[in-house]
């Protein structure tokens, strides 16, 4: 039988204060990052939707979902990491404090002369590359982006729209990253990659810190509306940079009251799940084309910076079928009339909704839901990381029933 959900409970979860250090993801860092983003063009707090009807229907205390389709006009959260990493890199280059730096200051003639030769290069399925291209565009700098085989032509065009050079390669994601790395070394470009390996850790750390803005906003939005803090946090993962960033912030913020953290990946690219199954404490890779509709999660090699955070704080690792992402997209787009706010959630953004719905509706997974303590006392926080970044694929799934 083909399982829609495979799971592995984490035997290595640590009590607060005994696991991987989180000093680079604490509240003070989060507020510094947020202050930087507030100075960027088009900054606005993204919505936090209260899915009250869905939570009642599923027998849960509450469901809130952060809608990152509104971020910087980029239709995804990734611009947070790319822009902050660009800011940190240029602050170091100019020997100034990022807290006193803004993109407006970087656009003065004196500073533009000092940074004019910077070229940023990265690999992406779309969202991260668009964020890097957008950040470079704000400063009149060049970006070069490599995309894996099978990438959406529309996503590539969106990257080129920001003035970047963009190539769809014949490589899978991890090999496209290696290509970007080689080109940076050969041409003296600046590699802005959202994953890390031995010897390349500083910039990926900055990117992870950049993602903290959405976590800080979500925490503050819950507080402002007198909503309960999450008992459950469901985070989707590719290499794990986003998941590590958001869980790191919430663990540091909530300390002994750490939520039940569930990390979900596509079956075809479930490197964190496989690492948990191996249960030796080390990150493990998956290889191949990793064909999944969740293109933003089609990554086979864990980020070595985020892995210890994920290993020490995740409650359960879940590997999910593509049909759950498709179901989440449809549920988000078409709630019952007059109930929850409809919103556009793309393939990688909607997996949390689809997973939660399946866990609470399919009797086959009732024991798993019980073990995860998903009941009337559960308050679940989800992040919709993207909107319809490839509108043709979105329409095919939501209207035509692809991956049903």
Swiss-Prot record:
<dbReference type="InterPro" id="IPR010081">
    <property type="entry name" value="DiNH2opropionate_NH3_lyase"/>
</dbReference>
<protein>
    <recommendedName>
        <fullName>Diaminopropionate ammonia-lyase</fullName>
        <ecNumber>4.3.1.15</ecNumber>
    </recommendedName>
</protein>
<comment type="function">
    <text>Catalyzes the alpha,beta-elimination reaction of both L- and D-alpha,beta-diaminopropionate (DAP) to form pyruvate and ammonia. In vitro L- and D-isomers of serine are also degraded, though slowly; it is the only serine dehydratase which can eliminate an amino group at the beta-carbon position. In vivo L-, D- and a mixure of DL-DAP allow growth. DL-DAP is toxic in the absence of this enzyme, it may inhibit enzymes involved in the synthesis of pyruvate and aspartate, as well as amino acids derived from them.</text>
</comment>
<dbReference type="InterPro" id="IPR019871">
    <property type="entry name" value="DiNH2propionate_NH3-lyase_sub"/>
</dbReference>
<comment type="similarity">
    <text>Belongs to the diaminopropionate ammonia-lyase family.</text>
</comment>
<dbReference type="Pfam" id="PF00291">
    <property type="entry name" value="PALP"/>
</dbReference>
<keyword id="KW-0663">Pyridoxal phosphate</keyword>
<dbReference type="GO" id="GO:0030170">
    <property type="term" value="F:pyridoxal phosphate binding"/>
</dbReference>
<dbReference type="InterPro" id="IPR036052">
    <property type="entry name" value="TrpB-like_PALP_sf"/>
</dbReference>
<feature type="modified residue" description="N6-(pyridoxal phosphate)lysine">
    <location>
        <position position="78"/>
    </location>
</feature>
<dbReference type="InterPro" id="IPR001926">
    <property type="entry name" value="TrpB-like_PALP"/>
</dbReference>
<comment type="subunit">
    <text>Homodimer.</text>
</comment>
<dbReference type="GO" id="GO:0008838">
    <property type="term" value="F:diaminopropionate ammonia-lyase activity"/>
</dbReference>
<keyword id="KW-0456">Lyase</keyword>
């Amino acid at each position: 039988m083909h399982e829609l959900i495979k799971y592995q409970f984490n035997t290595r979860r640590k009590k607060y204060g005994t696991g991987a250090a989180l000093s680079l993801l604490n509240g003070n860092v989060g507020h510094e990052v947020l202050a930087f983003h507030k100075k960027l063009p088009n900054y606005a707090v993204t919505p936090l939707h209260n899915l009250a009807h869905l939570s009642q229907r599923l027998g849960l205390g509450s469901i809130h979902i952060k809608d990152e389709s509104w971020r910087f006009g980029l239709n995804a959260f990734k611009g947070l990491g790319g822009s902050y990493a660009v800011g940190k890199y240029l602050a170091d280059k100019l020997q100034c404090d990022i807290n006193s730096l803004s993109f407006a200051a970087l656009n003065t003639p004196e500073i533009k002369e000092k940074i004019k030769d910077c070229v940023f290069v990265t690999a992406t399925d779309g969202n991260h590359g668009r964020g890097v291209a957008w950040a470079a565009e704000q400063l009149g700098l060049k970006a070069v982006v490599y995309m894996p085989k099978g990438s959406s032509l529309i996503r590539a065009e969106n990257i080129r729209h920001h003035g970047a050079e963009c190539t769809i390669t014949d490589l899978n994601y991890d090999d496209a990253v290696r290509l970007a790395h080689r080109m940076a070394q050969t041409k003296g470009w600046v590699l802005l990659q959202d994953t890390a390996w031995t010897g390349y850790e500083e910039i990926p750390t900055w990117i992870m810190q950049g993602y903290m803005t959405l976590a800080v906003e979500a925490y503050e939005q819950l507080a402002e509306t007198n909503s309960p803090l999450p008992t459950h946090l469901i985070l989707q993962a590719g290499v794990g940079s986003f998941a590590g960033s958001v869980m790191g912030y919430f663990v540091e913020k909530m300390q002994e009251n750490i939520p039940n953290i569930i990390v979900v990946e596509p079956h075809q690219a479930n490197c964190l799940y496989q690492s948990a199954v191996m249960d030796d404490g080390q990150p493990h890779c998956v290889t191949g084309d990793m064909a999944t509709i969740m293109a933003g999660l089609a990554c086979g090699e864990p980020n070595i910076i985020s892995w210890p955070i994920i290993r020490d704080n995740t409650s359960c690792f879940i590997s999910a079928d593509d049909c759950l992402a498709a179901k989440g997209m449809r549920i988000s787009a078409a709630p019952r009339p007059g109930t929850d706010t409809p919103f556009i959630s793309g393939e990688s953004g909607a997996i949390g909704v689809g997973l939660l719905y399946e866990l609470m509706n399919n009797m086959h997974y009732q024991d798993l839901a019980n073990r995860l303590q998903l009941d009337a006392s559960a308050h679940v926080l989800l992040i919709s990381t993207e909107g319809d970044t490839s509108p043709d694929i979105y329409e095919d799934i939501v209207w035509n029933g692809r991956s049903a």
